[in-house]
Amino acid sequence: MGLCQSEEEKVGTLKSRAIDKEIKQLQTSEERTVKLLLLGAGECGKSTVLKQMRLLTSKQYTDEELLTQAKLVYTNIVIEMDHLVKAMPAAGLNFSDPMREHDVHMLTLYIKDMQHKNFQQDAADHVEKLWKDPVVKRLYAERKELNIRDIGDNTEYFFENLPRISKEDYHPNATDTLLLRTKTTGIVEVGFEIKKVKFRVFDVGGQRSERKKWIHCFEDVNAIIFIAALSEYNEVLFEDETTNRMIESMRLFESICNSRWFHNTNIILFLNKKDLFEEKIKKENIHKAFPEYRGEQNYAETVAFIKTKFEALSNNPKKTFYVHETCATDTNQVQKILDSVISMIIQSNLHKSGLY
């Protein structure tokens, strides 16, 4: 009888261990999931960084996703050209060729009914003719100074590629997808796996109206990647045309790094759009954002100054920041940085659980 009890106990013990193992595996699976929060003010390049993460995992887009992106490419091209030509009167500009007024009229008619799978060739022709007008190109080059809204930094790329994009069999290539301008509204979650570790990345709408929706929801994230656009030091907000965009980005960064929700959270700062900044700093003085700056007006010194300004915003002297200068559209550069950042996050957060 005692022997039978002993065998029963053994069986019970084995079952108990099996259940414990299963529970532990479920817990381990959750622990192995790294949660990242992508933050930054509007137009900073968050969506592009998220696309780069997807490229890092070699995750292919579905046919349905590509079709959606193609439609968005068409829409962006037409709408952004419409914004450009409508800004001409306020800028005191006229077309080089009066015939372009006809193209504007036809484009306006097309916009009223844009339910097309592909670009209509005549619509593409009108956009192409407008883009070839020197005055339109001049207006595009000066769009930031004139505060013309909703014109992306990569719009020129799509205008230049109109002959390819307007073809009946057009499918967005990797560059199209990466440079495609998309606005994040609300919270977008993307999941993927790198180095046998599952990631959940949350991209949050950057405009002021979006920010109150999320801050209390993400206290358990493993790290925050905060993105600030270097090139915005002489620009103002879309929502408030008196507020400098760099200063607004710094205010948001300050509120995040000093938030009680993220007191112990790693923060990685991407100073993005370095390529645009490098060109702009040659012509536009950084004093527009930082009148106290006394250094040389060159890339190295101004970026170093901006870094110190961001780092000084933290009230926690023990908090470590990882700062990278990035060009989110430069796949090779960003992929190397993301690989380094992801490795750091894995080691920093999962090593604590004894898994690595």
Curated annotation (Swiss-Prot):
GTP binds at E43, G45, K46, S47, T48, D153, L178, T184, G206, N272, K273, D275, A328. Residues 176-184 are annotated as: G2 motif. Mg(2+) binds at S47, T184. Pfam families: G-alpha. The keyword Chloroplast does not apply. Residues 268-275 are annotated as: G4 motif. A lipid is attached at G2 (N-myristoyl glycine). Residues 326-331 are annotated as: G5 motif. Its cofactor is Mg(2+). PROSITE patterns: G_ALPHA. Residues 32-356 form the G-alpha domain. GO terms for cellular component: axon; cytoplasm; heterotrimeric G-protein complex; neuronal cell body; non-motile cilium. It comes from the Eukaryota. Residues 35-48 are annotated as: G1 motif. GO terms for molecular function: G protein-coupled receptor binding; G-protein beta/gamma-subunit complex binding; GTP binding; GTPase activity; metal ion binding. GO terms for biological process: adenylate cyclase-modulating G protein-coupled receptor signaling pathway; defense response to Gram-negative bacterium; G protein-coupled receptor signaling pathway; olfactory learning; positive regulation of gene expression. Keywords: GTP-binding, Hydrolase, Lipoprotein, Magnesium, Metal-binding, Myristate, Nucleotide-binding, Palmitate, Transducer. A lipid is attached at C4 (S-palmitoyl cysteine). The keyword Translocase does not apply. Belongs to the G-alpha family. G(q) subfamily. Guanine nucleotide-binding proteins (G proteins) are involved as modulators or transducers in various transmembrane signaling systems. Involved in behavioral responses to P.aeruginosa by controlling the expression of daf-7, a member of the TGF-beta family, in ASJ sensory neurons. This is Guanine nucleotide-binding protein alpha-2 subunit. It comes from Caenorhabditis elegans.
